Amino acid sequence: TDGTSEEMKQFGGRLKVIEHTENRGVSAARNRGILHAKGKYIAFLDSDDLWVKGKLKIQVAFLDDNPHYPLCYTDEIWIRRGKRVNPMKKHAKYSGWIFEKCLPLCIISPSSAMMRKNLFSKVGLFDEALPVCEDYDFWLRVSVRFPIFFINKKLIIKRGGHPDQLSSRSWGNDRYRVIALEKLLSEPCVGQEERESVLKEMEKKCQVLSKGFFKRGNEFEGRYYREIMRRYGIEI
């Protein structure tokens, strides 16, 4: 609906365009592309973002030279309402075993990442049941299993701040992060130390959500997040 398929026609047969007949969400679109891909590496470009020239070349070279890393990602230039802004401290980037850093919020932009296609056979595809935070869910599944490398170069431009963005339209994204955290607790690769970290983060998010819903008069949802805390032995 954003005119992408029309733009692709200018490239002739050099690019293969795969379309859904109806909007099934970003996860379904990514998953279909992954399943149709023939190459050994996968990269995404969301509609609001731009790749800087040379991005793919730099990442391919890194993954070729570092077979023990399944994924690398880059730094970003942020544009909000047409003006360049500096990311906040909470969006800082890290290399290595970054699972703990990925728990509060999503620090990897999908458009900045490149990964080996065989990674999806190890961690699964994007969760199509999540309308937002599907990337948060995916990065957690990756980072709890593998180290991730940060390329300290600004190789994508993230444009945001307009009202039609999906992330701008979804109130309380932590609701979906809690779902992702609950899912993670059932993963056999999650050890006791990681489990404790997940529960601490879940407690923070459930406390905020519960208080927020009670404040807005939604007692049903407020009690729901208290019940999640009780289920995992978290004191209220």
For the regions a language model picked out, list residue spans one by one.
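C-terminal subregions of glycosyltransferases and related glycan-biosynthesis enzymes
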Residues: 160-236
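Conserved donor NDP-sugar-binding/catalytic core segment of glycosyltransferases
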Residues: 54-86
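GHKL-family ATP-binding catalytic core of two-component histidine kinases
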Residues: 38, 52-53, 116
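Short aromatic/hydrophobic "clamp" motif used to bind/position activated sugar donors
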Residues: 42
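Glycine-rich, basic loop-to-helix element that forms the pyrophosphate-binding segment
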Residues: 7, 20-37, 58
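Conserved nucleotide-sugar donor-binding catalytic segment
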Residues: 35, 92-180
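A conserved acidic beta->alpha catalytic loop
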Residues: 1-6, 22, 46
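The conserved acidic donor/metal-binding loop of glycosyltransferases
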Residues: 46-50, 75
